[in-house]
Amino acid sequence: MPSSAQNVGIKALEIYFPSRYVPQTELETFLGASAGKYTIGLGQQNMSFCDDREDLYSLALTAVSSLLRKYAIDPNTIGRLEVGTETLLDKAKSCKTVLMQLFGDNTDIEGVDTYNACYGGTNALFNAVNWIESSSWDGRDAIVVAGDIALYETPAARPTGGAGCVAMLIGPDAPLVLEPVRGSCMKHVYDFYKAYFKSEYPLVDGQFSNTCYLGALDACYQRYQAKQRARQAAKTNGTAISNGHQGSFLDTFDYFAFHAPNCKLVAKGYGRLLFNDFKLESGSFDEVPAQVREADFAASLTDKALEKLCVSLTKERFVQRVEPSLTAPTNCGNMYTASVYAGLISLISNVPSDRLQDKRIGMFSYGSGLASTLFSFRVKGDTTEMARKIGLQDRLSARTAVSPEFYDQMCKLREKAYQQRNYTPEGSVESLAPGTYFLVHVDDAYRRKYDMKPYLSMCEDRHEQAV
């Protein structure tokens, strides 16, 4: 039996996003929106998308095969594989079983799929960590996959789409250690759901969903704080805070990554944390603004003036602690389950390893319906090699911009392909980056066949074969 695992967390990270994107400035014009509505109003710059050549399975195959290749991971060292997604292609067969093709003769791998809107990846992460910390652990590592394609039918929601997949190697002695405290909020609401099975488009109440997100954040933050204080673990990091405030619970987090339906909502969410501190620990501040002091918690969720005030009061901290996590979200759009982990990848790509050591990274994961958790990582190892292997900025820069008209055509192509059998995709293989898996054909029995676009070098990897 292996000895008890210590410092369990993320040992390696990989991200995949499609090779083409549509600029949000051009989408504003195409959809008849005012200039800046998407870029300033939503905080989005570009949006990734897929044609009918890519789907959840291809995204996950690409991300996991790349993780195995870049980090030279022996498939036999993996004992658990979990997938979090809401982009379902089959109501019975899991995406995890499709990924088993990458693991050769190693069929002794636990785990399946988890789904609840954008939250499934986080639940998969917790499952993997709990397995490694349990008496059932056999000494091997786990891989967690979070990936989705976000696509909306109505013009108002179109700019909040996106696509991407994150693969994480989970194990002991990790540089990103999952801390034990977390606060969760689970409720029954209909803010966003996919009950109409004849379309991949969701049913959405956008404003209500934003309110649900912020209300869940309140509850998770308060519960995390209460549990952390109960463990006598909460302490400030000694960082000077603007507006003369220092010592609030918000300052126990050196950095923060949020689930990002859009980056403007992230800024509102971060401001909301300070509002909670003002209300719940007013003694930590020299002065609490009257507008905050008099606000009711429930009514404050839709108070735009209060929202602006809190965003303004946290602006300096936001730039230092949260903005580094927004590179992928603002350039790729909403990746649903992968979103918060794309934020984590952005953070370690933008902040040098030496500045991250022993820092706490707050994480807020939200999935409509709803399921949410606020948790944290403590950095206890070098992240330099991880950031180098990811190569986030270079890969973002290597993408190709397309027109909104072309994007609209690809949306129609996906509509045509949805739930079809005897179907051969029409999308371009040439546009895909080397190492990308793509759909070749769906046969008469709905069985899907994939292949991989080869790397430019002649070197072949044993994990990357036609499947």
Curated annotation (Swiss-Prot):
Disulfide bonds: none annotated. SUPFAM superfamilies: Thiolase-like. It comes from the Eukaryota. PROSITE patterns: HMG_COA_SYNTHASE. The active site is at E86, C118, H259. One of its GO terms (biological process) is ergosterol biosynthetic process. It is an enzyme of class 2 (transferase). Pathway: Metabolic intermediate biosynthesis; (R)-mevalonate biosynthesis; (R)-mevalonate from acetyl-CoA: step 2/3. Keywords: Acyltransferase, Lipid biosynthesis, Lipid metabolism, Steroid biosynthesis, Steroid metabolism, Sterol biosynthesis, Sterol metabolism, Transferase. The keyword Lipid biosynthesis applies. It catalyses: acetoacetyl-CoA + acetyl-CoA + H2O = (3S)-3-hydroxy-3-methylglutaryl-CoA + CoA + H(+). (3S)-3-hydroxy-3-methylglutaryl-CoA binds at A35, C118, T160, S209, H259, K268, N334, S368. PANTHER family: 3-HYDROXY-3-METHYLGLUTARYL COENZYME A SYNTHASE, HYDROXYMETHYLGLUTARYL-COA SYNTHASE. Hydroxymethylglutaryl-CoA synthase; part of the first module of ergosterol biosynthesis pathway that includes the early steps of the pathway, conserved across all eukaryotes, and which results in the formation of mevalonate from acetyl-coenzyme A (acetyl-CoA). Erg13A and erg13B condense acetyl-CoA with acetoacetyl-CoA to form hydroxymethylglutaryl-CoA (HMG-CoA). The first module starts with the action of the cytosolic acetyl-CoA acetyltransferase erg10B that catalyzes the formation of acetoacetyl-CoA. This is Hydroxymethylglutaryl-CoA synthase erg13A. It comes from Aspergillus fumigatus (strain ATCC MYA-4609 / CBS 101355 / FGSC A1100 / Af293) (Neosartorya fumigata). The lineage of its organism: Eukaryota, Fungi, Dikarya, Ascomycota, Pezizomycotina.
